[in-house]
């Protein structure tokens, strides 16, 4: 029984989860907004908020902690974006740097999908790129005519 165990396993091995969150976090930092499943988005939220907190602390230690969480070629680039662009925007905020907006279920497998984005930071992608998962109004849907 998994009593008092934090986090979702997402049906992946530990190394696969580590790589998944590293890649999702890097994409979120670069694009400021991504679309993913609800479960991944909920886990990614705490992962990214910790990275922003490290960036706010700044210094060599914070940079190394970020690069430890996002290894590889993109680690330095992500650390620079977090420290120089994102962290200053949240200097007066104590947490809650991201928001999760639920969208329609994905068409092919009906998976619940969400948009995760940074609060108060303009995204780099356009609304047309996000339109594939926009909200449906009540009453809309597949109606036979």
Which functions belong to the PLM regions below?
Residues 1-19, 23-145:
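Structured, basic alpha/beta domains of bacterial-type, RNA-associated proteins
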